[in-house]
Amino acid sequence: MRHIKIIKSISLIILLFLITSCSNNSAMKPEDFKNKEPRLIIEEYLSGNVKAWGVLQNRSGKVTRQFSADLNGTWDGKQLILKEKFNWDDGEVQDREWTINKIDEHNYEGTAGDVVGKAKGFSYGPAFKFEYVLLV
């Protein structure tokens, strides 16, 4: 069981990289992974407790902050409620709660209190990209 949690944590690091570092100008697109395995089903993957680690980079790619995060997701068959608690290396603690709806096999929409409008999610194979504007 411990091995599954470690693998899940490592996989989440990769997932968060895709979520946070992919921009509209990125050459890498989720569709590029449509025939790859294993398939990432985000609502299953994020159900329950997940631990994550990551970095924040500025536009030039310099790491400006690091974080660890505790995530807890609940999937009801239509909607994923994802609670995130970020612990930043400078001592800041930040909470966010997402409501994520699955539109179809590949598309998701999400909202959170500090997100402008709706987030758009795209899932193909093992890749998931989440595009949104965050209020800072």
Where are these regions (language model features)?
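Bacterial N-terminal signal peptides that target proteins for export
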Residues: 1-11
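N-terminal helix-cap/turn-to-beta initiation motif at the start of protein domains
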Residues: 33-49
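C-terminal motif of bacterial Sec signal peptides marking the signal peptidase cleavage site
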Residues: 18-21
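Bacterial signal peptide processing site
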Residues: 23-25
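Hydrophobic helical h-region of N-terminal Sec-dependent signal peptides
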Residues: 12-16
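Central antiparallel beta-sheet cores of small beta-barrel/beta-sandwich binding domains
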Residues: 53, 57-136
